[in-house]
């Protein structure tokens, strides 16, 4: 699925099942919440935090939950792009070009990355 197709799919879903988009501010808050849930999984899977004994997501060390939370973040981001008229394909292409021009030589000699 392309980014454009994802935006279109989310838009159809919202119109068919979601009634309408939440307000932009509400979706910003929901995005923050979803990023926090992703951060919790990351801190337990890759960081120093331990899984709670009662948390079933820890059974596979959060592998399934990690993907689910990333998808939730993407969903809300697609909603926000749709409701604000942002073409994420176009913006991602511009962002990659900007980073390439700005950072093409930036990390080549970074000893922390070469280790």
PLM features: what roles do these ranges have?
Residues 1-70, 74-115:
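Flexible "arm" and connector segments at domain edges
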């Amino acid at each position: 699925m392309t980014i454009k197709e994802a935006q279109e799919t989310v838009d159809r879903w919202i119109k068919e099942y979601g009634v309408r988009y939440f307000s932009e501010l509400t979706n910003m808050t929901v995005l923050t919440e979803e990023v926090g849930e992703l951060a919790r999984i990351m801190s337990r899977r890759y960081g120093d935090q331990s899984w709670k004994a009662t948390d079933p997501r820890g059974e596979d060390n959060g592998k399934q939950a990690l993907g689910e939370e990333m998808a939730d973040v993407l969903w809300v981001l697609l909603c926000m792009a749709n409701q604000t008229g942002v073409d994420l394909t176009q913006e991602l292409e511009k962002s990659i070009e900007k980073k390439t021009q700005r950072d093409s030589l930036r990390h080549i000699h970074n000893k922390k990355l070469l280790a």
